[in-house]
């Protein structure tokens, strides 16, 4: 393995694609889970109390 510029070429792939449930570009293709709504991880929508307070 080499460090620096040659290894930066491996970072060009898309990590997140469009989610089937929420439609946002936050579905991790490798982990098969959505960061925004929790699709693939749980049946329920991902929501927390601090989200209401923060305006999400």
From Swiss-Prot:
Pfam families: Ribosomal_L37e. One of its GO terms (biological process) is translation. Zn(2+) binds at residues 19, 22, 34, 37. A zinc finger (C4-type) spans 19-37. Its cofactor is Zn(2+). Binds 1 zinc ion per subunit. Gene3D superfamilies: 2.20.25.30. Keywords: Metal-binding, Ribonucleoprotein, Ribosomal protein, RNA-binding, rRNA-binding, Zinc, Zinc-finger. GO terms for cellular component: cytosolic large ribosomal subunit. GO terms for molecular function: rRNA binding; structural constituent of ribosome; zinc ion binding. HAMAP family: Ribosomal_eL37. Binds to the 23S rRNA. Belongs to the eukaryotic ribosomal protein eL37 family. This is Large ribosomal subunit protein eL37. The lineage of its organism: Archaea, Methanobacteriati, Methanobacteriota, Stenosarchaea group, Methanomicrobia.
